[in-house]
Curated annotation (Swiss-Prot):
Keyword Chaperone: no
Protein name stated in the entry: Cytochrome b
Remarks, miscellaneous: Heme 1 (or BL or b562) is low-potential and absorbs at about 562 nm, and heme 2 (or BH or b566) is high-potential and absorbs at about 566 nm.
A GO-annotated cellular component: mitochondrial inner membrane
Quaternary state and interactors: The cytochrome bc1 complex contains 11 subunits: 3 respiratory subunits (MT-CYB, CYC1 and UQCRFS1), 2 core proteins (UQCRC1 and UQCRC2) and 6 low-molecular weight proteins (UQCRH/QCR6, UQCRB/QCR7, UQCRQ/QCR8, UQCR10/QCR9, UQCR11/QCR10 and a cleavage product of UQCRFS1). This cytochrome bc1 complex then forms a dimer.
Source organism per UniProt: Brachytarsomys albicauda
InterPro entries noted in UniProt: Cyt_b/b6_C, Cyt_b/b6_C_sf, Cyt_b/b6_N, Cytb/b6-like_sf, Cytochrome_b, Cytochrome_b_C_euk/bac, Cytochrome_b_N_euk/bac, Di-haem_cyt_TM
Sites where the protein binds heme b b566: H97, H196
Family: Belongs to the cytochrome b family.
GO molecular function: metal ion binding; ubiquinol-cytochrome-c reductase activity
Length: 380
């Protein structure tokens, strides 16, 4: 008799995705982040669900409802900090996952890559709206500043901002709709993640060499399930350490002050995982230009397949582009640091130079280095 996992309509989907999936034998730990992102998503939905049971999305009670969760709900503090730090772990895994995709040329699977970009945008939107919910100072002013950027859109900008706010300022209507969207988006992300996997399984996984690995594949289970379990244990260890020892390390102390529209915090800044984009936004002295640069800083990922000039897929055997890649990584760290600094000398000029370097490496230097490497290796 054929095994039920191969015949049952539902189980055979699971089987072909996680059990009998032919996987390149050479994929390294950099391929673990997909499963880690899945774990992060499930964990965020679970903790978020329990938080939503006690949270109230009203401007008068939102801040105190979060305090109530931390003080009075059984293990409420744990759920709240797992959710907050879980978001940080989510973004660490996301950035590493995208970074792996760029390094090993995984963007050549264009459908998978494009769904991934949509997933990245959806996750960023979810995280931004979640940051508004505790209704602290940084929540309120972050929401005000970021939504206000849309007013830079010619002609319809102001109307659009007021439409999103549901009034003439960030208020009760804004908080309620942000809570609604923050609740629904993770489920949309889950659906998109399934589509992401569907497209990936059409082509099969890439591997570190960037070469065709059809001749050397092994079943996903048990080899990679056990490898993923190790990754998950490491992830949970780091998350637990953060949650129990330094729960507020990645947050902003200003968010422990209840939202006050009459008092602006000295430095308005988003969560750490948006700082690189925030630095690019601030480095352009024009509002519309800044907004465009902000969007393009992430949307630029979509043209990676078009900018690929090398005859090799991966950077594994491309030392010149490798150097550029790691300069790009260092540049992103620099932008993240600048995003958290006040707008004054020398941070302004450093931010502008780092922003120029970011776009230059991706749009100019990497494509040129690909052509140079082809010439050196006589691959044309």
């Amino acid at each position: 008799m054929t095994n039920i996992r191969k015949t049952h309509p539902l189980l055979k989907i699971v089987n072909s995705s996680f059990i009998d999936l032919p996987t390149p034998s050479s994929i390294s730990s950099w391929w673990n982040f997909g499963s880690l992102l899945g774990v992060c998503l499930i964990m965020q939905i679970a903790t978020g669900l329990f938080l939503a049971m006690h949270y109230t999305s009203d401007t008068t009670t939102a801040f105190s409802s979060v305090a109530h969760i931390c003080r009075d709900v059984n293990y409420g503090w744990l759920i709240r900090y797992l959710h907050a730090n879980g978001a940080s772990m989510f973004f660490i895994c996301l950035f590493l996952h995208v970074g792996r995709g760029i390094y090993y040329g995984s963007y050549m699977f264009t459908e998978t890559w494009n769904i991934g970009i949509i997933l990245l945008f959806a996750t960023m939107a979810t995280a931004f709206m979640g940051y508004v919910l505790p209704w602290g100072q940084m929540s309120f002013w972050g929401a005000t500043v970021i939504t206000n950027l849309l007013s830079a859109i010619p002609y319809i900008g102001t109307t659009l901002v007021e439409w999103i706010w549901g009034g003439f300022s960030v208020d009760k209507a804004t908080l309620t709709r942000f809570f609604t969207f923050h609740f629904i988006l993770p489920f949309i992300i889950t659906a998109l993640a399934m589509v992401h996997l569907l497209f990936l399984h059409e082509t099969g996984s890439n591997n570190p060499s960037g070469l065709n690995s059809d001749a050397d594949k092994i079943p996903f289970h048990p080899y990679f399930t056990i490898k993923d379990v190790l990754g998950i244990l490491v992830l949970l260890t780091i998350l637990t350490a953060f949650t129990l020892f330094v729960p507020d390390l990645l947050g902003d102390p200003d968010n422990y002050i209840s939202a006050n529209p009459l008092n602006t915090p000295p430095h308005i800044k988003p969560e750490w995982y948006f700082l690189f984009a925030y630095a690019i936004l601030r480095s352009i002295p024009n509002k519309l230009g800044g907004v465009l640069a902000l969007i393009l800083s992430i949307l630029i990922l979509a043209i990676f397949p078009l900018l690929h000039t090398s005859k090799q897929r991966s950077l594994m055997f491309r030392p010149i582009t490798q150097v550029l890649y790691w300069i790009l990584v260092a540049d992103l760290f620099t932008l993240t640091w600048i995003g958290g600094q006040p707008v004054e000398h020398p941070f302004i000029i450093i931010g502008q130079l780092a922003s120029i370097l970011y776009f230059s490496i991706i749009l100019i230097m990497m494509p040129i280095s690909g052509i140079i490497e082809n010439k050196i290796l006589k691959l044309n």
